[in-house]
Design a protein with these regions (language model features):
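Glycine- and charge-rich intrinsically disordered segments
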Residues: 1-2, 76
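Long, continuous compositionally biased terminal/linker segments
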Residues: 35-79, 106-147
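Major-groove DNA-recognition helix of helix-turn-helix-type DNA-binding domains
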Residues: 27-31, 96-106
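Short, flexible coil/linker elements and helix-boundary hinge sites characteristic
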Residues: 25, 53, 97-99, 125
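Polyanion-binding surface elements
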Residues: 5-22, 81-96
Length: 147
């Protein structure tokens, strides 16, 4: 059986990464638009995914990423020894309600006071690497590199 395939454009990078996470095939890119191959019987599901992304945790994660990218170097001393250098991990920690103190160089410093908070911070930092948010971040980065 030969399925009819339709080309569907997606202009938002976050939506494109989210759609890619749901196994839709990327056909190419034209300027800032990503083109996906979608079986005709999957068109409604595809469109529903685009809407779902805007109200998902992945959109929140992307919002945290964008905020962190805009963050300028903090000009004062930061009294914290808990930091991460991975932008995605920092966004993941922000989503889990850890308070960001500032950025120094490539490091994002967090406000941690108790051994329990430190343990939770370390656990969340490790969880990020195997989370769907890491996969989403990886897809964002890959899509940016497609010319």
């Amino acid at each position: 059986m030969n399925k009819e395939i339709v080309s569907k454009p997606v202009q938002d990078l976050g939506i494109a990464a989210y759609v890619l996470m749901h196994q839709y095939q990327l056909a190419g890119r034209k300027e800032k638009t990503f083109i996906f191959k979608v079986a005709k019987e999957k068109l409604k599901e595809f469109e529903d995914l685009k809407t779902a992304y805007l109200f998902s945790e992945f959109h929140d994660f992307d919002h945290c990423l964008m905020g962190l990218k805009k963050l300028e170097e903090y000009p004062f001393t930061i009294e914290s020894n808990k930091f991460v250098t991975d932008l995605g991990a920092a966004a993941f920690l922000l989503m889990h309600k850890f308070k960001l103190l500032g950025k120094k160089g490539r490091s994002f410093y967090f406000d941690i006071h108790t051994p329990d908070e430190e343990s939770q911070f370390d656990e969340m930092n490790l969880q990020y690497a195997s989370s769907p948010f890491h996969d989403f971040d990886s897809k964002l980065m890959s899509l940016k590199k497609i010319l």
